[in-house]
Amino acid sequence: MLNRRDCGAAVEVAARRHLERAGLRWLASNVCFRGGELDLVMYDVMSVVFVEVRYRQQESHGSAAQSVDRRKRRKLVMAAQLFLQRHPFLAQVPCRFDVVEGAGRPLQLHWIRDAFRLDDC
């Protein structure tokens, strides 16, 4: 049985593979900044995609995607801004925020494109 950290890492790897099979290109994983972390940064047809990966064994407390609340969205936006400052060649490219939620065993992934917008934060 995997511990919480290993389980999260396995779900992130599965999410990355899922997105790559869908045609996205991987740019970075687990990018940490003070106050926030980006699970995956991908590139999709002229867009930088910041991906939050969430996992829930059971949905008794809501779906994994529902756990990306306003506070978490703000942290993701702040981390995305810092990422773009460090990679200025991407700063002029449109960006979006996606969520990949994993649930159950065996793992099932659900990709939510454009899961939230800046004005949702």
Curated annotation (Swiss-Prot):
Xref: SUPFAM superfamilies: Restriction endonuclease-like (SSF52980)
Annotated Pfam families: UPF0102
Entry superkingdom: Bacteria
InterPro entries (UniProt xref): Restrct_endonuc-II-like, tRNA_endonuc-like_dom_sf, UPF0102_YraN-like
GO molecular function, one term: nucleic acid binding
Similarity-based family: Belongs to the UPF0102 family.
The name this protein goes by in its record: UPF0102 protein PD_1586
Lineage, highest ranks first: Bacteria, Pseudomonadati, Pseudomonadota, Gammaproteobacteria, Lysobacterales
